[in-house]
């Protein structure tokens, strides 16, 4: 037994050293910002142009970054196991699609969960229930500064009529698990930041 541990130790130390080197290497890969300027700023779009230097020494004189506030999306499920979806037109792809309730974290929101609760109530009129965050992801890590906080809310119920903002034109739909599965399998849900948490939730709950 003693010989086994003696024989194992060098390999363990080598692996530990490898992890340390890998972590250091990852830390050293961060780009250096040489200069930065805003090229567009308004309510819905803030674009920044950076001049950056890579760890290799190469310089990219024009690297464009889009600054956004944090986003939220919610898998809301009623007490009778129906999924709360909305259906709306998305001008970017020119299509009307089923989506989860989602939105932006406002400065007045105390937390991403508070923002998600507000968005669910405003868009669908549903609220209450038990909430947990399932993942935090990036829609485009190479060019966007924000993250999407993804929640699951179970046992939600209709507490009021929707309070949709001007410019919002959507309808509320309650879908069964089979209908959600079908949407996913047929690639009918186009928002990547909604597809990811849906697959994760269904996988964790062994519903696929």
Question: Where are the regions that the model predicts?
Answer:
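Short, positively charged and aromatic/hydrophobic N-terminal segments
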Residues: 7, 14, 18-21
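Hydrophobic alpha-helical membrane-insertion segments
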Residues: 1-11
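Active-site-adjacent beta-strand/loop module that shapes the phosphate/pyrophosphate-binding cleft
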Residues: 48-56, 140-159
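Short, well-ordered beta-strand micro-motif
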Residues: 49-53, 76, 152-154, 174-176, ...
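Conserved Nudix-box catalytic region and its N-terminal flanking loop in Nudix hydrolases
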Residues: 23, 28-30, 63-68, 73-118, ...
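Nudix hydrolase/Nudix homology domain
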Residues: 23-31, 96, 133, 142-145, ...
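Extreme N-terminal tail/first-helix region
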Residues: 18-42
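Acidic, metal-coordinating catalytic segment for phosphate/diphosphate chemistry
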Residues: 35-73, 79
